Amino acid sequence: MEEKKIRKVTLCDICHQSKAVMKRPKNLQKLCKECFYHVFETEIHNTIVDAQLFKPGDKVAIGASGGKDSTVLASVLKTLNEKYNYGLTLVLLSIDEGIVGYRDDSLATVKRNQIQYEMPLEIISYKDLYNWSMDEIVSCAGIRSSCTYCGVLRRQALDRGAAKLEIDHVVTGHNADDMAETVLMNLLRGDIARLERSCSILTSSEGSPIKRSKPFKYTYQKEIVLYAHYKKLDYFSTECSYAPEAFRGTARELLKALESVRPSCIMDIIYSGEHLVVAHKKKRTTEKYKNKPKKNIETEVNSDGSVNLTKKTDGSRCEKCGYLSSNKICKACVLLAGLEMNRPKVNIENNTAVEGSAKVMKTLEQLSF
């Protein structure tokens, strides 16, 4: 009679009682569901406390896209806010870029999350804000430029949405994988200036009083997916239709290849980026730079020839849209101005399709040259 094979059960490395259901990618620790929830949430809490991201009474907007990262972020922040008594008022802030078949479906998920988490929801539309949808921008500027436009417009839309809600802090679901990808992208481009921003857990737009932070800075994407799966969270999993053409996709594939050989490479890349930033800062404070006047200092010459040094006040505004900007024209307005140059051509093509060539011919006959 053939003996039955006994299947060995792997126990959790923490409680040593329950069956392990996952192995952590960062340290290969085997955990059961409950211990995984505890470790996952505690690490994020420690990140928030160490970076001093919040203070009691803060009104915080969660950048909600309906994807796994922002959905897990909303769930975890709600849990931590109640468990550790942060004293935060949490709201959901969504940006509708106007991508048919993608954003409209993901916003339906956000609206369900609003009910599940009992949080107010504000939706800011590109079309309402800029008079352009992302689909229109891509048809005009091409798919390869989509992330350039969307990144700039989205950052400003988040700031405008937060200002509308009288919020001074926005949290986003950028995770450790995203951070490592951005470090790689900036290194491949040779863009050390942007490296500091990509490694920082707390950032803000130039001239804007609104802070943006990334509580998931040290959280692996795989663990976020597992948390959403085991908690049975409602999220939208389809990738943006324009994302495959982005340069980030190249960095992502490179990161996956590196991770398969060295699982700790994600954290290693983030730490390396932070050390490069420190080295870059030290270089800027050498004697070569010390005697140069600082950009944020104004000199005022008195009648007796003495000089007063005063700091420039923040709050410069774009001459076109009136939004906070360190330049006369903000980057969003520069990009939109380039799009507007092609707007008449788009309109003529639309009229031709709808009303035929007769109207166009009649218009041309009325023109005087």
Curated annotation (Swiss-Prot):
Gene3D superfamilies in UniProt: HUPs
| E.C. numbers | 2.7.7.-
- CDD domains documented for this protein: CTU1-like
GO cellular component terms, semicolon-separated: cytosol; cytosolic tRNA wobble base thiouridylase complex; mitochondrion
The yes or no answer to whether the keyword tRNA processing is present is: yes
- Tell me where on the tree of life, at the top rank, the source sits: Eukaryota
What role is this protein assigned?
A: Plays a central role in 2-thiolation of mcm(5)S(2)U at tRNA wobble positions of tRNA(Lys), tRNA(Glu) and tRNA(Gln). Directly binds tRNAs and probably acts by catalyzing adenylation of tRNAs, an intermediate required for 2-thiolation. It is unclear whether it acts as a sulfurtransferase that transfers sulfur from thiocarboxylated URM1 onto the uridine of tRNAs at wobble position. Prior mcm(5) tRNA modification by the elongator complex is required for 2-thiolation. May also be involved in protein urmylation.
Q: Which family does it belong to?
A: Belongs to the TtcA family. CTU1/NCS6/ATPBD3 subfamily.
What is the name listed in the Swiss-Prot or TrEMBL entry for this protein? Answer: Cytoplasmic tRNA 2-thiolation protein 1
Please name the source species. Meyerozyma guilliermondii (strain ATCC 6260 / CBS 566 / DSM 6381 / JCM 1539 / NBRC 10279 / NRRL Y-324) (Yeast)
Q: Which gene encodes it?
A: NCS6
